[in-house]
A protein has these predicted regions:
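Cyclophilin-like peptidyl-prolyl cis-trans isomerases
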Residues: 1-156
Length: 156
């Protein structure tokens, strides 16, 4: 995303997003005010339909991960973004954050949602929002469950 796109996202602040899965809906609030580059990237991909018809390729007792167009954990959008962190956004149950390789600036499209607190990840991964509804859905996800679509929700 451009600096202008990130600046617009920062002005908007909190952005409601719905992740429609084969198990139900997950509602999250993205913190564009604190993580403008990361949120602008995620929203841009979502609005382009990048995440549509994807899968959760990784599910463990503490995390679910998706956003890879290949469904393997090795794919992405063809670019990476700079690591962005904020001390008030922690790796706690319900946090949504960007997955990446061992290089800090390697996130692209893959994201994770935590099913359990993982403070060990704080400061190393870009937490950019929080689930506000649908953690029961997150808890029921298994490998291969579909991400039908991700869209910015109506704020009303």
């Amino acid at each position: 995303p451009s600096e202008e796109e990130a600046a617009r996202i920062a002005e908007v602040g909190a952005i409601p997003v719905v992740i429609e899965t084969s198990k139900g809906s997950i509602k999250v609030v993205l913190r564009g005010d604190l993580m403008p580059l990361t949120v602008a990237n995620f929203v841009k991909l979502a609005e382009r339909g990048f995440y549509d018809d994807g899968v959760f390729h990784r599910v463990e007792d503490w995390v679910v991960q998706g956003g890879d167009p290949e469904g393997t954990g090795a794919g992405g959008p063809g670019y990476t973004i700079k690591l962005e962190t904020h001390p008030s956004l922690r790796n706690v149950r319900g946090a949504i954050a960007m997955a990446r390789s061992t290089h800090p600036d390697s996130a692209g499209s893959q994201f994770y949602i935590l099913k359990a607190d993982a403070e060990r990840l704080d400061g190393q991964y870009a937490v950019f929002g929080q689930v506000i509804e649908g953690m029961d859905v997150v808890d029921r996800l298994v490998v291969g469950d579909e991400i039908r679509l991700i869209r910015v929700a109506d704020a009303h």
